Amino acid sequence: MSDPVVVPRAIVAGHGDFANGLISAVEVITGRRGVLVAVSGRDLSGSNIENLIRRTVEETGVRVVFTDLQAGSCTMSARRVFRDTADAVLIAGVNLPMLIDFVFADQVPAPEAARRAFERGRSAMCVIGEGK
């Protein structure tokens, strides 16, 4: 029996190996591979990052991008790619709980799952200790 075909649902983009590292952790924790596609901005100009994100969106058909920094080059590039795409969602400041939630929400349309995952990711952050 063959494994079920997994269709990518989102891109994770960031500096260095950020995207690959996060995706690796998500796959280890969830056991689900192929749901997220990594884009690294390492050694690329803003226009090259934009072209890479655009090409990945065209090849996969995804309408969700998670990025590392709100004002980072990957976020700015994804904003330009999705400028005229009404059904697209871009979430900056991605974290591990957010992506785990997104990956498990496979019965929900990806844009809606991304919005829900954003709330989960935000609520998963906490400060422990007083730091005195």
Language-model features, listed with the residues they occupy:
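N-terminal loops that bind phosphate or other acidic moieties
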Residues: 1-132
